[in-house]
Regions:
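Conserved beta-hairpin
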Residues: 7-43
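Eukaryotic intrinsically disordered, low-complexity regulatory linkers and tails enriched in Ser/Thr/Pro
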Residues: 60, 98-219
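Extended aliphatic helical segments
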Residues: 27, 31, 39, 50, ...
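Acidic, Ser/Thr- and proline-rich intrinsically disordered linker/docking segments
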Residues: 1-14, 51-130
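Phosphoinositide-dependent membrane-docking surfaces
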Residues: 32-33, 43-58
């Protein structure tokens, strides 16, 4: 029996998809976790699982395992994408003893897992998302609307509003990396930086590149 099994891949939770290598699978005797950054962070106990089955949509790039579960707060469609043979992955999960673990005793750790499950899979506070989306759209519209109100629009509607929006995303991603206080404002209670680490690094890179490009275009 293996103590634990880990694998990097992709994940689909509902209609949201995290491509390789933005998702991690972790399994031991007590828990199965899928960390797909902001797409979702899911944690299961053996009793939460109905079945784990092979999932094949596109050869090689569309193979994975489908996790059928009982958690009402989670989306019913949970797939972990992998380049490995899905049957091999399921076999490795079985070797951890997770699927055969029928221990019914409730521990302190079980209560923490239940609390996290009740929060749903999305790791970021919903009010934070709403505020960010509204502010982002207002900044973009501050460039787009005046641009198309011109008699003869020329060039691209990239101005100071879009630049501030991208800069805001870049600054937020940097603060996620370095500030625990900022993380506590953004993340749900009990969530950690590891839950969004890959997304944060990707956001730093993409928003940083775009901010430099937009700044040059506005000079």
């Amino acid at each position: 029996m293996n103590e634990k099994f880990t694998l990097t891949g992709g994940a689909r939770i509902g209609t949201a998809n995290a491509s390789y290598p933005l998702a991690d699978l972790y399994v031991d005797k007590e828990v199965l976790k899928i960390n797909a950054s902001i797409v979702g962070n899911l944690i299961f106990q053996p009793k939460d699982i109905i079945s784990i089955e092979e999932y094949n949509s596109i050869p090689i790039i569309g193979n994975g395992i489908k996790i059928n579960h009982r958690i009402e707060k989670y989306n019913p469609k949970v797939i972990f994408w992998t380049f490995k043979n899905p049957a091999t992955v399921i076999n490795e999960i079985k070797k951890t003893g997770f699927l055969e673990n029928t221990n019914s005793e409730i521990s302190t750790e079980d209560l923490k897992i239940l609390e996290r499950q009740n929060q749903g899979g999305f790791p970021i506070k919903k009010p934070v998302v709403v505020i960010f989306v509204v502010l982002w759209n207002l900044l973009f519209l501050s460039d787009i609307i005046p641009f198309f109100l011109q008699d003869k629009p020329e060039g691209f509607p990239i101005g100071i509003g879009m630049n501030i929006a991208i800069g805001l995303a870049f600054l937020s991603s940097i603060l996620l990396l370095i500030s625990e206080k900022f993380r506590s404002l953004i993340l749900k209670e009990g969530r950690e930086f590891d839950d969004i680490k890959k997304f944060a690094y990707l956001l730093v890179f993409v928003s940083g590149m775009m901010f430099v490009q937009f700044t040059i275009m506005n000079l």
